[in-house]
Curated annotation (Swiss-Prot):
This is Pyridoxine 5'-phosphate synthase. It is an enzyme of class 2 (transferase). One of its GO terms (molecular function) is pyridoxine 5'-phosphate synthase activity. It comes from Rhodopirellula baltica (strain DSM 10527 / NCIMB 13988 / SH1). It is found in: Cytoplasm. Homooctamer; tetramer of dimers. It holds the Pfam family PdxJ. It comes from the Bacteria. Keywords: Cytoplasm, Pyridoxine biosynthesis, Transferase. The keyword Cytoplasm applies. InterPro entries: Aldolase_TIM (IPR013785), PyrdxlP_synth_PdxJ (IPR004569), Pyridoxine-5'_phos_synth (IPR036130). The record marks E154 as: Transition state stabilizer. Disulfide bonds: none annotated.
Amino acid sequence: MPHFIDLGVNVDHVATLRQARRGQEPDPITAASLAEQGGADGITFHLREDRRHISDRDVELFVQTVQVRTNFELACAADVLAICCRVQPDWALLVPESREEVTTEGGLDVAGDSGRIADAIQMLKDAGIATSLFLDPEPNQIEAAAKLQVDAVELHTGPYALARGAAVQHELRRLADTGKMIRDAGMRLHAGHGLNYVNVRPVAAIDGMAELNIGHSIVSRSVMVGMREAVAEMRRLLDSVTIAAQ
């Protein structure tokens, strides 16, 4: 069955578990292979400036061994940009980054910092890498991204994932409205952050959604059922949305 919504699996937290003992296992490269077997359409990994989980060696091995699309998540930092341009993943996702944060806490401020981001985008484009931006579902940010002519925008779904009660529908509407802006501007619509097996279907059902990137919930589930099955379960959820829409 065709995968009308692509599933990108973020394997960062396999590396987080490895780093808890500063050892060699679990191996995120093996996890990526198992995710592919479970139905992942892409593998996402974030090489942070502090190298808290994914390592430079991991990045090299992902690009060399992953058979589906590779999605290199990074900040606009010169050394990491240079690594990305050298290893040439299929996609680069630019995100904000703070050493104090536990995980990415919000989208890029493209509207307020377009110069630095534009320079990073140009470097990536010159290297032949498709580019996307991680943005909050705010119209001014989408308008700024459209001017930079990126290939995709990944909407930050964290506020939706944390919402309760009536706020859930409010956040879904924000995602749907800005998603339409993204598609109308000719960019590919992606989304991610905080999505799990309970809350993913309404986001997957947003008109024109092309790709969801999901990490922590899949890695958490994999502790119980294995990576291949954890990814397959998420794949079935996304496929059920596609079937319902037909």
